[in-house]
Design a protein with these regions (language model features):
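TRNA-recognition modules of translation machinery and tRNA-sensing kinases, especially anticodon-binding
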Residues: 2-321
Length: 321
């Protein structure tokens, strides 16, 4: 499916988004949000019946993000919640302090909160508290307002954005099958919405020289794919969905283990004679399909224009416009 990509920067800034004075942070108009709502309903229709739905706030535990390994991979993207601490005189002094020394900004101290960088990060410690993953595995629908410190004038790169994910937790076979299924279903959704796309292997923006090696390994092992859709240009399409296989990273980090046939029926009297590896359980594997809600919305307007009434019938029906 081919179409001419219109000027998305002018399109979005003039009619859909209002600049805040900070790159990548926008106020969104009613017509933009109408499409966002339609997308969320469409995504929900593709949710499996056994899926547990969780909605997370835009902040999460600093201790949890440290334990997850995020700082080792993306320290430059993390945003921390900071506040003024101390007595009334301390805080007043900071507010009225010497601007040459940084003023109140220089007096800020970190709290125990950070801005959520991806919708699935708050999920894993919750799952870990529940004990063994059942034999059938687990499915979650999670969403959050997320933040990544990537200031840019490019209209398709928000610093604060909405992410929706379906997360699969279970055995390697279960997670691989889940991702393969979604790599078939996601293009069907794009076709329904009248969007051009291509799917390619990809890597996360790991930090530093060591990060370059991590990115190479991620591509070589086909751990991440992205569905790319023209927003700014057809030559440089934008990643609007991703299909990720984390292997046992989060299982190992949070000690999430499966409860398979070998372990589920072990009686207390049989523990000593049971196979140690079976009793210990296998580390759970995880994977997710992530939807960039704001990017998908921008892609739709870039493809079909501002007037929702002129959009393809299949897209209008799918989004209930």
């Amino acid at each position: 499916m081919n179409y001419m990509v219109r000027d998305p920067l002018r399109l979005t800034t003039d009619a859909l988004l209002h600049a805040s004075g900070v790159d990548g942070v926008f106020a969104r108009t009613a017509v933009f949000e109408r499409v966002v709502d339609g997308l969320n309903v469409l995504i929900s229709r593709h949710r499996a019946p056994e899926t547990e739905v969780l909605r997370f706030p835009p902040v999460m535990s600093r201790a949890h993000i440290q334990k997850s390994g995020y700082l080792g991979s993306f320290p430059n993207l993390l945003g921390a919640v900071c506040c003024l601490h101390g007595s009334e005189s301390d805080i007043r002094g900071a507010v009225e302090g010497d601007k040459a020394k940084g003023g109140w900004v220089g007096a800020l101290d970190a709290t125990d909160l950070v801005l959520t960088p991806a919708a699935c990060y708050p999920l894993y410690p919750l799952v870990a508290k529940r004990g063994r993953v059942p034999q059938a595995g687990l499915l979650f629908d999670v969403a959050s307002d997320c933040f990544r410190h990537e200031p840019s004038a490019q209209i398709d790169r928000f610093q604060t954005f909405r992410m929706r994910e379906f997360v699969r937790i279970g055995t390697p076979d279960q997670v691989v099958a889940f991702r393969a299924d979604w790599m078939t279903r996601a293009p069907e959704i794009a076709d329904l919405l009248g969007l051009s796309y291509k799917t390619e292997t990809a890597s996360d923006p790991f930090f530093g020289r060591a990060g370059k090696l991590m990115a190479i390994n991620q591509v070589e092992q086909s751990l991440k794919f992205e569905l790319l859709i023209p927003v700014r240009s057809a030559q440089q399409p934008t990643a609007c969905m991703s299909f990720n296989y984390h292997r046992d990273h989060f299982g190992k980090t949070w000690d999430i283990k499966t409860w398979d046939i070998k372990t589920r029926d072990i009686k207390t009297s049989d523990v000593k004679s049971a196979d140690p590896q079976s009793e210990a359980g296998a580390l759970a594997h995880t994977g997710c399909v992530a939807f960039g809600i704001d990017r998908l919305t921008l892609a739709l307007f870039a493809a079909h224009g501002l007037d929702l009434r002129t959009w393809p019938a299949s897209a209008r029906d799918a989004l209930a416009l």
